[in-house]
Amino acid sequence: MDGCRARRRARQAIANEQEPIVLEIIDVDFNNPEHGRQVLAMLNEYASGPMGGNTPLPEYAQRNLIPELAKRPTARALLARVDGEAAGVAIYIEGFSTFACRPLVNLHDLGVSPRFQGQGVGKHLLAALEDRARRLGCCKITLEVLEGNAVAQGLYRKQGYEGYALDEHTGRALFWQKKLAV
């Protein structure tokens, strides 16, 4: 990620029941140790929760994730911070739509710290992601969401996301995987 983009910051106020907080959304520089530490902490918190499998990231991922993301020019992230403290993260990867012949962005991970949930952090991360995708000339943003994650599905719907289907006869797309031995 170039330095100019990494220095761009979007500041937004969020209403909290106690007092307004100032949310800062930054483009992550995976070569910045503080950014890397905060992204890893957010992902570990997400992985340790019910929608992440209730297990921290494996030791291998904790040691290697940030350097591996830094090697990949299409891997990017946004970090939401409140007073310098990580409040949320969105990791996204640029892909390509063959049918539209244009780039797309896949939101790979979206996590908000439990301390900041319900305060608009996810909404602001999604808005910032949409802004970045538009700047890249993307035709769409894709994501996967667990069937049982009603809160995330509600957030995505409110932001204009919907299940993917070509038409009613072929049905909705399913997200499949095949794990490969390493």
Give residue ranges: language-model regions:
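Conserved acetyl-CoA-binding loop-helix of GNAT-fold acetyltransferases
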Residues: 112, 118-131, 154, 158
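A short helix-loop-beta-strand connector motif used in the catalytic cores of GNAT acetyltransferases and
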Residues: 67-79, 106
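Conserved N-terminal entry element of GNAT/NAT acetyltransferase domains
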Residues: 4-8, 13-37, 41, 48, ...
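Conserved beta-hairpin
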Residues: 75-90, 113
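C-terminal "cap" of GNAT-fold acetyltransferases
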Residues: 24, 30, 42, 137-182
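A conserved beta-strand-loop-helix scaffold within acyl/acetyltransferase catalytic domains
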Residues: 82, 92-99
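Conserved acetyl-CoA binding element of GNAT-fold acetyltransferases
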Residues: 102-114
